[in-house]
Amino acid sequence: SGYRWIIDPIDGTTNFAHKLPLYGVSVALEQIETKTPVLGIVLVPALNQCYHAILGEGAFCDKKPIKVSQTQTMKDSLFTTGFPYDRNNSLDVLLTYYK
């Protein structure tokens, strides 16, 4: 078909396990040949929110359009990470993703 579904049934497993509301069910559709994501949906049940985006049509929280911040400086920005929980990876290896 040229497409594949990518599903994370509990995106934010650690938050879910600790009863923190920031977890969700993530689903994406990727065009295989170009590895281009064409749509994505994240359902956040604890907050009763649904985020979705379609390539070329924008991103939404429920039905409200959302966009990335227009912040121009790092000092005014908020950065978050999602390091894997494999204790065999050293910090140096993980930090190569952010250089």
Regions found by a protein language model. Name each.
Residues 27-30, 61-66, 74-76:
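Short, surface-exposed linear patches
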